Amino acid sequence: MIQQETRLKVADNTGAKELLCIRVLGGSKRRYAYLGDTIVCTVKDAIPGGNVKKGEVVKAVVVRTVKSHRRPDGSYIKFDENAAVLLKGDGEPRGTRIFGPIARELREKKFMRIVSLAPEVI
């Protein structure tokens, strides 16, 4: 469950290390983002020489949340951290590698490129 001012780790190799959510996309009254939702973030921490700089405003998709997510079969999935992957304007990932596991819900939300780059889909 991601809302405004939530800090997230970055799960790709774009050079950003930490993000701050500044808007949840999907309507003016939308308060929370869950697995597979798109958010607007600002980069709070980045490595030198990376593709993104500190203070840059970027779009990202949520790939891991601490809040448990109920699946249609009745099982629950949750992770140890909140993490996101940075997106280009066309919805493709900006990085070329994804770190850590991602949720199966991204396949249903049509983020196939992220699913194919991920080392593990849970």
UniProtKB/Swiss-Prot annotation:
<dbReference type="Pfam" id="PF00238">
    <property type="entry name" value="Ribosomal_L14"/>
</dbReference>
<keyword id="KW-0699">rRNA-binding</keyword>
<dbReference type="GO" id="GO:0006412">
    <property type="term" value="P:translation"/>
</dbReference>
<dbReference type="InterPro" id="IPR019972">
    <property type="entry name" value="Ribosomal_uL14_CS"/>
</dbReference>
<keyword id="KW-0694">RNA-binding</keyword>
<dbReference type="GO" id="GO:0022625">
    <property type="term" value="C:cytosolic large ribosomal subunit"/>
</dbReference>
<comment type="subunit">
    <text>Part of the 50S ribosomal subunit. Forms a cluster with proteins L3 and L19. In the 70S ribosome, L14 and L19 interact and together make contacts with the 16S rRNA in bridges B5 and B8.</text>
</comment>
<comment type="similarity">
    <text>Belongs to the universal ribosomal protein uL14 family.</text>
</comment>
<dbReference type="GO" id="GO:0070180">
    <property type="term" value="F:large ribosomal subunit rRNA binding"/>
</dbReference>
<keyword id="KW-0689">Ribosomal protein</keyword>
<dbReference type="GO" id="GO:0003735">
    <property type="term" value="F:structural constituent of ribosome"/>
</dbReference>
<dbReference type="InterPro" id="IPR005745">
    <property type="entry name" value="Ribosomal_uL14_bac-type"/>
</dbReference>
<dbReference type="InterPro" id="IPR000218">
    <property type="entry name" value="Ribosomal_uL14"/>
</dbReference>
<protein>
    <recommendedName>
        <fullName>Large ribosomal subunit protein uL14</fullName>
    </recommendedName>
</protein>
<dbReference type="InterPro" id="IPR036853">
    <property type="entry name" value="Ribosomal_uL14_sf"/>
</dbReference>
<comment type="function">
    <text>Binds to 23S rRNA. Forms part of two intersubunit bridges in the 70S ribosome.</text>
</comment>
<keyword id="KW-0687">Ribonucleoprotein</keyword>
